Amino acid sequence: MTPKESGKPISCAMKKLKGKRSKILVLSRDAGTNELKPTKGRAHRACIACRKRKVRCSGNIPCRLCQTNSYECKYDRPPRNSSVFDREVSDDSSLYAQRASHEREDSKGPISSIDYKKVVETIFPPETLRQILASSSFNSQNFLDTIKTCLLQGQLNVNQVIRQSLPKDTPWHMQTSVPLPPREIALKFIQKTWDCACVLFRFYHRPTIISILDSIYEAEKHGKQYTPEQVKTQPLIYSVLAVGALFSKEDLSKDSKATREFYTDEGYRYFLEAKNSLDFSNITDIYSIQAIFMMTIFLQCSANLKACYSFIGIALRAALKEGLHRRSSIVGPTPIQDETKKRLFWSVYKLDLYMNCILGFPSGIDESDIDQEFPLDVDDENISTIGIKFQDWRTISSCGMNNKHTKLILIMSRIYKLMYSLRRKPLEEDSRTQIVSLNDQLDNWYAQLPDILKVDTIRYRQTQPPLTVSANDTSSPYTKPKKLLYLDFLLSKIVLYKPFYHYISIDPLDIPEFQFQIHMAENCIEVAKKVIQLSYEMITQNLLSGSYWFSIHTIFFSVACLKFYVYQTEKGLIRNGKVDSDIHNATQLGSEILSLLKGASNASKRTFEVLNQLFKEFNEKTSVLSEQLLNIVKLQRQESSGALVPQLQTNNNFTKCQGELHHGQQHHQTPATSLRSILNLPQGEADLKFQNTNNESHTTTAAQEEYLDKLLAEFEEFDYSINRVLPDVIDFSALIGQDSSANNQIFSSEFSSDPTVN
């Protein structure tokens, strides 16, 4: 009798991704269906009960032993060791790919219960289809290719139509176009999402998600129909897997090109499946809002900011529609649901604030319209359906760390409203008081952090060891969160100091009235150096991911500040006339860090290219305009008395100036918003002279005044763009290679000085 006839296991060799040994896939014939099925291998983990009794565990939930004896089946958390994780993902990826391939082949089989005619009529109404077919320019091949492209890109969703055409007793798993990965791979993806993308965004209850995921795999295993709760959580599961796949490929070596591409494709397919499973016009449950939030993270880490802003807007408005911004929404029925609502709202709201600060858009809801409480500082394990066990006072939970981050983003939002408002006022005494108050709020926020969340003093060191990546720093679970917190703290400081950065080239001895502005500009330089030092420490400890937009944006922004300073110095516009060695070294180190992060993944490369393109778009125009204006100012100062007015005008308004110029003011008129007022030139000099190419002096003409005013009008338009459209990026992207002394004079009209403020 042959092995096939006897039903004994049949072995077939499968090639491993790593190593020379073959991995054996054992198949056995099912007695009921007479089909070959994989034999259950050794479980990756054993439950607590099996390990205590030292028996073999089946790896299920509940496992065979616990189910038989009615024990409580619990598992420890998956291992967090990065090297183990990398090795397991690489070892299992071939099995994962083969399983996915088999399931995709199975999905191609005919399902006789689907009414394909109804599907076609729903997608293409008969009258419209007849008009298309009757057209003289109709090409059947192009028509089919277009449909195929739309299906692959997720623009054409036929899943809903197919689901409606299936009988009610059809198992739901047959309706999913993208199968779930093996459970072990799914758990690794979820853990990767939590450890990389959601360190400072706790919007979920981990045990609940894991429990639902296990129930889905159990339903798949036994061919059961999904429950309503499982159906609702399906988009959330796929969106979490998408982000996990996006970050997982960074752990693989660059030589594993096929595996990295596999993770890229899988992440995108999971994202499309999550998007196609949602009805964005009718978001009414918490799971759907969580799914949209995770899709927002996926888009942001893929550098798709336009779609990211749209998705976070949908999530915020869905949360508002459900009343999550009000304390009255906390009505149970369980403490888990109440805490999840609070966590979800504050995560969505602070991400919306962050995106507004980056893209220069107004906030969707004001802070004064919110009375929702912050989530409790307790770990997920201490929250159950019957009550909450409060946290040990000596520790802080991950949710407590997220509360600290939320308070920081709220301060950043207040800074943005004051410093980047369309109706910003001149820098008078009350404005300076507000700026100092915001700076104190940031300092107080950091001072009130628990000691365990405070980083060691960050000082830039001129001599740095070679930039190499080591294993993850697992000495403390607080290491990565506290450094990410401090990175966003430094970003908030830069957002506060950035509007004064143009004053970096002014010598306070020449213009003592600008001491406040110059001090703020110098602070911006120091904070940028701290960002570079902190990112260097994080990347050497393997705590920094190239796909994590929040960190790479902050680093890129800091490098832009330092490069602008270096350029200004090389042009001879900085008072000391040479570049400080620590600034020059920090600039080079920052560039090396960005280059290393750029090569981490395709998402990292795209993020780098998006930010780098913002430099190039504004560099040429600002450089030409600033050099022209700077030369004119120098000529005027040479011909004037050389002394600046003691009291600078404080009521200048660029919009008013531009409007008056367009109404045809003559050059002999000198209103308060005239060119000389903006440039801080003596008002009594009505006959300022210019030197032409033949060294012949002549008085200012209307054409020259018009030309100068045109330059100022263009600067006003540019100033509006860089401070509103993308305030955190375009501003310094434009300033790489720019002469800014003229721009400093322009800003002086907006921010008047007061020597009494230190």
UniProtKB/Swiss-Prot annotation:
SMART domains referenced in this protein's UniProt entry, alphabetically: Fungal_trans, GAL4
DNA-binding positions: 47-73
One matching Pfam family: Fungal_trans
Keywords, in A-Z order: DNA-binding, Metal-binding, Nucleus, Transcription, Transcription regulation, Zinc
Family the UniProt entry places it in: Belongs to the ASG1 family.
PANTHER family, per database record: ACTIVATOR OF STRESS GENES 1-RELATED, THIAMINE REPRESSIBLE GENES REGULATORY PROTEIN THI5
Protein name in UniProt: Putative transcriptional regulatory protein YJL206C
Taxonomic lineage: Eukaryota, Fungi, Dikarya, Ascomycota, Saccharomycotina
